[in-house]
Amino acid sequence: DKFFYPELSALAEVNAMEARSMNRNPTPWNNVNLTALRIGSLNCAGLQAHYADLKVDYSLLKADIIHLSETSLTGLGDCQYPLPGFDVDHCVVGNGKGVSTYYNAKIAEQKVCLQLIKGDNFQISKVTLPRVDSINVYRSSNASIPGTLEALKKLIDEEKPTLVSGDFNLCYKRNPSNTLTARLLHDGFTQLVEDATQIQGGLIDHLYWRDCLEPIFEVPVVERTSSYYSDHDTLLVTLAEKSIS
């Protein structure tokens, strides 16, 4: 009988590749063994147009909270655009505007409240949880920056960890000192996104994070994916609480 044996160097390389694989080394977003709050933010370029795509966006669906902007809903009728395992609240304004927030059963049990701010040219959603608040903003390019900032500031709890996400239509690279960003940074927030988020090269999708003076959370881990159905990147934030020593 003849036997075939693997080349030892080839076998060693296979084992090395396996050790480096994503299955063995999942990112925080994909690590099922990591207890954390996962928040996804995406300009979906129209919820009705891309509803079927969202239902199979398995990376985004790992979120506990999904913030969608520029949903372009003109009305709901009998369709709430449900995602399996999620509740949803929509802020319906019209074409090229609007935000929707989906949250899973774990969040529904904890949720203190959900607020929606419906401006003509900006919309804001806030999910209040016992330990952290998650705020999402869609600001049209012609919206008043001071007006958007004023509405946002009214929703921010100065004593609580807060994540602010969304499409601000303000390029952080070209205009990092804009009034809204400058004020949030002055108030102790950190802008977590460093690279362009939109296909034309603008960094217009922002993530602002501020913890308590005595931090409750580890430094947020930001991951991103490029969805085929939107010209914006999806921003995925993993928030893990600090272990009590």
Predicted regions and their residues:
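Active-site-adjacent loop/helix micro-motif of nuclease/hydrolase catalytic cores
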Residues: A49-D53, N142-L149
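Beta-strand cores of modular interaction/reader domains in eukaryotic scaffold and signaling proteins
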Residues: H67, T101, D133, L163-V164, ...
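Surface polyanion/phosphate-binding segment centered on an Asp-His-Pro turn
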Residues: D1-N15, T162, C171, H186, ...
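N-terminal, active-site-proximal structural segment of metallo-dependent hydrolase catalytic domains
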Residues: D1-C79
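Active-site-proximal beta-strand elements of phosphoester/diester hydrolases
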Residues: A36-G46, K126, P130-S141, S165, ...
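Structured beta-strand-rich core segments of catalytic domains in phosphoester-bond hydrolases
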Residues: T71-R131, V137, P215-T225, D233
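Conserved beta-strand elements of beta-rich interaction domains across eukaryotes
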Residues: G46, S72-T74, K106-A108, R139, ...
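Metal-dependent phosphoesterases centered on the DNase I-like endonuclease/exonuclease/phosphatase
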Residues: V56-V93, P146-L213, S227
